[in-house]
């Protein structure tokens, strides 16, 4: 047993309290993720105006739409897919976003689905650009290159919040014994950090490579979708399935099943892009 194995004993998931409201590390990490994604996008607009011909004010307006779509979709998606008492929320819809419990205590809004957020993001992007659909693929590509590094902080937030824990490490796994984290007296994979690396860093490198080697609008979001799906599928083997969900056909988790659907959506966007997108002009 090393110091890393027992790191959860060394810190509190609550960063600080403000006026009786507990601020979690996850909330701070999520805020960092938004800021990083925002400024990464601005940098991309500045560095590559041929690929991203968007004015700053225009992007700021779009970013608000996209973020709202992500938050709404992520929360609603979690309730519909993962919440065991989802029928209650269908008749008490306002409770989905109520940060207080029935006793009036502030508990925050817990439970967000990445894939639900993805659907919300796509819907918001379409609604924002419906009057000028030529820009839809440009917006999607911009988020594809800007999101992954921000996503890293989101998963680090999950780790600090001690949630979405990993599967139990096999006793014969030497590496697992080194990197594992003690949770409920069991050594588990740090799946949140594995996801941060695979779904954040590796996917970013994939999209960055595509940016350098493709000249068609819409391909970056396709590479992101396919790359994320593959990395999430792999990472799920180290992540404990949600207790209320378990595993399904071929022992696949819900995250893996939704990732397969994400592949289908990505291929649909690829088909749309190849038919409606124009080649990007070379920089002069």
UniProtKB/Swiss-Prot annotation:
Record-linked HAMAP family: Lgt
- Keyword set for this entry? Cell inner membrane, Cell membrane, Membrane, Transferase, Transmembrane, Transmembrane helix
A GO MF term: phosphatidylglycerol-prolipoprotein diacylglyceryl transferase activity
Provide the topology term for how it sits in the membrane.
Multi-pass membrane protein
EC number of the protein: 2.5.1.145
Named in its record, the pathway it takes part in is: Protein modification; lipoprotein biosynthesis (diacylglyceryl transfer)
Q: Which family does it belong to?
A: Belongs to the Lgt family.
Is Cell membrane among this UniProt entry's keywords?
yes
Q: What is this protein called in UniProt?
A: Phosphatidylglycerol--prolipoprotein diacylglyceryl transferase
Please list the coiled coil stretches: none
Role description: Catalyzes the transfer of the diacylglyceryl group from phosphatidylglycerol to the sulfhydryl group of the N-terminal cysteine of a prolipoprotein, the first step in the formation of mature lipoproteins.
Which residues are noted in the entry as a 1,2-diacyl-sn-glycero-3-phospho-(1'-sn-glycerol)-binding? 155
Q: Which PROSITE patterns match?
A: LGT (PS01311)
User: Is Cell cycle tagged as a keyword?
Assistant: no
Where in or outside the cell it occurs: the entry states:
Cell inner membrane
Which Pfam families did the record assign?
Answer: LGT
TM ranges are 18-38, 62-82, 106-126, 136-156, 190-210, 218-238, 252-272
Please name the source species: Helicobacter pylori (strain G27)
Enzyme superclass (EC): transferase
Record's superkingdom?
Bacteria
A single GO BP: lipoprotein biosynthetic process
Q: Gene Ontology cellular component?
A: plasma membrane
């Amino acid at each position: 047993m090393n110091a890393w194995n027992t790191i959860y004993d060394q810190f509190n998931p609550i960063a600080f309290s403000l006026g009786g409201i507990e601020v979690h590390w996850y909330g701070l990490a999520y805020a960092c993720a938004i800021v990083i994604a925002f400024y990464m996008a601005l940098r991309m607009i500045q560095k590559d105006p041929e690929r991203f011909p968007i004015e700053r004010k225009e992007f700021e307006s779009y970013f608000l739409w996209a973020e709202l779509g992500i938050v709404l979709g992520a929360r609603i998606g979690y309730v519909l897919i993962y919440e065991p008492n989802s029928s209650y929320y269908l008749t008490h819809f306002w409770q989905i976003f109520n940060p207080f419990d029935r006793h009036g205590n502030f508990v925050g809004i817990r439970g967000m689905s990445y894939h639900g957020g993805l659907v919300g993001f796509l819907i918001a992007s379409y609604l924002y650009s419906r009057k000028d659909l030529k820009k839809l693929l440009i917006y999607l590509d911009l988020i594809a290159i800007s999101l992954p590094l921000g996503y890293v902080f989101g998963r680090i937030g999950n780790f600090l919040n001690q949630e979405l824990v990993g599967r139990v490490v096999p006793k014969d796994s030497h590496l697992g014994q080194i990197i594992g984290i003690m949770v409920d007296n069991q050594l588990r994979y740090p799946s949140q950090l594995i996801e941060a690396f695979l779904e954040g860093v590796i996917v970013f490198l994939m999209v960055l490579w595509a940016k350098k080697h493709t000249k068609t609008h819409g391909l970056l979001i396709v590479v992101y979708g396919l790359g994320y799906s593959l990395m999430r599928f792999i990472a799920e083997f180290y992540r404990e399935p949600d207790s209320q969900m378990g595993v399904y056909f071929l022992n696949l988790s819900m995250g893996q099943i939704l990732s397969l659907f994400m592949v289908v959506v990505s291929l649909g966007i690829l088909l749309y892009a190849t038919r409606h997108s124009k080649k990007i002009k070379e920089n002069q």
